[in-house]
């Protein structure tokens, strides 16, 4: 018999991507950060579990539960957060209260929303106050310019009454909720003030007349 030496090289499973060969969840997280659509296709492919989750029963259980989600973007985000490969996106606001004094006409303004980090996040807006109007009541992390989103709102003049008008804008994510208080003060028009003063003076004069009698 002749012994023929040979060497067998066994290569771990991998996925060929725009970043080259990737073999683990750390690599996959980097792919999701830099080539998100490619990472999404890979995440929902039949090969994902065999390449990235072999020997990791916890990650496999999380994956099996999330891949059936109605929102694919949320599934990927929750998976990466659950396996500690990215931080959850959190929001912060530049203010929590706005006050408008001596309001006279419709006006528009905005609230600056800042997000931390990368990934997918869905945001919902609710308003309390008939004088407030917002065009867009749902948006996602894709609508941010860098880390900033400007939430525009309008105060509608024809729905603001004399005196104090209180309203709120609620900003909600699956993990956070914010409330921005809006206070609008509208004074009585000068002409109406003059007429009101005349009426009060007439009432006072009439009262004095009857008291004198």
PLM region descriptions:
Residues 1-213:
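Feature for long, exposed domains in two main contexts
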């Amino acid at each position: 018999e002749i012994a023929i030496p040979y060497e067998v090289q066994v290569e771990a499973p991998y996925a060929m991507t725009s970043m080259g060969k990737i073999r683990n969840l750390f690599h996959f997280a980097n792919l999701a950060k830099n080539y998100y659509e490619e990472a999404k296709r890979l995440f929902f492919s039949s090969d994902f579990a065999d390449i990235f989750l072999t020997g990791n029963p916890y990650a496999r259980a999380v994956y099996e539960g999330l891949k059936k989600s109605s929102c694919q973007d949320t599934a990927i985000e929750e998976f990466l957060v659950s396996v500690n490969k990215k931080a959850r996106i959190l929001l912060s606001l530049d203010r929590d209260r706005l006050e408008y004094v001596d309001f006279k006409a419709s006006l528009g303004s905005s609230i600056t929303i800042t997000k931390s980090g990368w990934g997918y996040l869905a945001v919902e807006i609710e308003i309390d106050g008939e004088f407030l109007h917002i065009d867009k009541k749902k948006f996602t992390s894709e609508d941010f310019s860098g880390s900033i989103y400007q939430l525009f709102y309008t105060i509608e003049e024809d729905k603001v009454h004399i005196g104090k008008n209180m309203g709120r804008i609620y900003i909600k994510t699956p993990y956070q909720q914010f409330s921005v208080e809006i206070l609008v003060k509208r004074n009585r028009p000068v002409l109406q003030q003059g007429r009101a003063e005349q009426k009060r003076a007439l009432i006072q004069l009439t009262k004095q007349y009857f008291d004198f009698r």
